[in-house]
Amino acid sequence: MRFSKTPFCCLFILFSAMVLFPLLSGCGADRAAQKKKAGTLANLGNAMAAEGNTRGGLQKLLEAAKLDPDNEDIYQQTALVFRSLGDYQLSLKYFRKALELKPQFPEATNNMGTVYLLMGDWNNAIKCFREAAEDIKYETPQYAYNNMGLAYFKMGETQKALQNFETALRLSRSYAVVYLNLARLYEKKGDFKEAEANYREAILYRPKDPAGHMGMAKLLIKQGKTEEAKESLIKIIKDDPRGLEGREARKLLAALQS
């Protein structure tokens, strides 16, 4: 007598499916839990870095990257922390990882350009900034145009720098950093009137930023406007008593009063 194998086969397949489904579900749940933990670690790392604990924040971000190795945002955040630590090669490495995962990532491209800018590699910096600026999906191209202007300014190509700064301002009239860069450009050219006007615009949009007040104070000193310069220096000391600009302002004020 021959027995049919069909019922046994059906039972085996059914049993296998019953076992396999929980395993696959478990893997999916574990993966989701890992991604969630990675996100928590990344947020903690960014917060620590923002508060000044840069190395501690970096460790959290590296842990996050291990848990979620396909997350381009975590790689970019890690790259930014390496940049702040002055480790430019590792910063570039992590920006490249982010861009491998997401080639059209203009924020990362622009930020990678800032690393080249800090390294003095103007050509690669400009290449990154131009690519980011021309990406139609980039929501803040004014950052890339400002950075490109700064790179050209560093290269001594004043006209190209001016064009990019002006483009950045057309995109965002309240972008204080551009006014600051324009002020420095005009000051270097010896056009103190335009420099002063742009310093005032920078201060208008970022009144608490000591950089604008310091630039203005130094320009006023050059022009012999010492009383106005003193007002700017006192403002810096009040707003940034322990910072670099605050300490420099004290020295300049003491020199003016002696």
Regions found by a protein language model. Name each.
Residues 33, 67, 101, 135-137, ...:
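Structural marker of alpha-solenoid helical repeat scaffolds
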Residues 35, 214-258:
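Terminal, low-structured helical/coil segments at or just beyond the last alpha-helical repeat
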Residues 43, 77-80, 111, 147, ...:
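Canonical tetratricopeptide repeat
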Residues 50-51, 84-85, 118-119, 135, ...:
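Register position in tetratricopeptide repeats
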